[in-house]
């Protein structure tokens, strides 16, 4: 596949869900790909947000493509916070200390990223905030001064019905919490995520095939 093919798939999913074209943004996951590949196979087709899940690779690519919009989508340990300089959106906040560490570092950077809270999907997932804990975590993260835009969810890879349920539950809770951004869906399940209300879909391997 390619960026145009994925974009066509997103537009088709929007239409099938009765959503206006362009309401879903493609986030291009670039891990393992060179700057030349990113320029030639992704940015040649538009100024899409680019995303990494490894701190050092993110740092190096932000330096190489400083004009791009960068997102971080991986687990956050304390030693990764310093690599978030130049990032506009962090998708994977699951504990208030992470937000506080970002806010503290951003005071020196001069610009803070917005954040999403990662919602636990209940399927043995290692990361994410339990749904019942999200209201309290949201309050604590907002208290750090960071802008909380929405929720991020990862669905089971091999259960379409369960994936659709995870996406629907996440969208419903985001609405209940007054959050508008929904980072849901990857290469194999983004049509289901779009149908549930995703505003950001994280696609990697399909862009470079």
UniProtKB/Swiss-Prot annotation:
The keyword Cell cycle does not apply. One of its GO terms (molecular function) is pyridoxal phosphate binding. GO terms for cellular component: cytoplasm. InterPro entries: Ala_racemase_N, PLP-binding_barrel, PyrdxlP_homeostasis. Keywords: Pyridoxal phosphate. PROSITE patterns: UPF0001. It holds the Pfam family Ala_racemase_N. Coiled coil: none annotated. The modification N6-(pyridoxal phosphate)lysine is found at residue 31. Belongs to the pyridoxal phosphate-binding protein YggS/PROSC family. Pyridoxal 5'-phosphate (PLP)-binding protein, which is involved in PLP homeostasis. This is Pyridoxal phosphate homeostasis protein. It comes from Deinococcus radiodurans (strain ATCC 13939 / DSM 20539 / JCM 16871 / CCUG 27074 / LMG 4051 / NBRC 15346 / NCIMB 9279 / VKM B-1422 / R1).
């Amino acid at each position: 596949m390619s960026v145009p093919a994925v974009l066509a798939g997103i537009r088709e999913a929007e239409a099938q869900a009765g959503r206006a074209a362009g309401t879903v943004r493609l986030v291009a996951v670039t891990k393992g790909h060179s700057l030349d590949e990113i320029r030639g196979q992704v940015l040649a087709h538009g100024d899409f947000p680019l995303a990494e899940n490894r701190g050092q690779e993110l740092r190096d690519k932000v330096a190489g493509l400083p004009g791009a919009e960068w997102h971080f989508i991986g687990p956050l340990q304390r030693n990764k916070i310093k690599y978030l300089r130049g990032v506009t959106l962090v998708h994977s906040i699951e504990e208030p200390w992470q937000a506080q560490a970002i806010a503290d570092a951003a005071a020196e950077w001069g610009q803070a990223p917005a954040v999403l809270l990662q919602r636990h999907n209940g399927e043995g997932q290692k990361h994410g905030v339990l749904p019942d804990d999200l209201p309290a975590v949201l309050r604590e993260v907002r208290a750090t001064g960071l802008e909380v835009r929405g929720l991020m969810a990862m669905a089971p890879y091999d259960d379409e019905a369960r994936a659709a349920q995870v996406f629907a539950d996440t969208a419903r809770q985001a609405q209940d919490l007054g959050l508008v951004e929904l980072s849901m869906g990857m290469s194999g399940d983004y049509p289901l995520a779009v149908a549930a209300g995703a505003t950001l879909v994280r696609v990697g391997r399909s862009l470079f095939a």
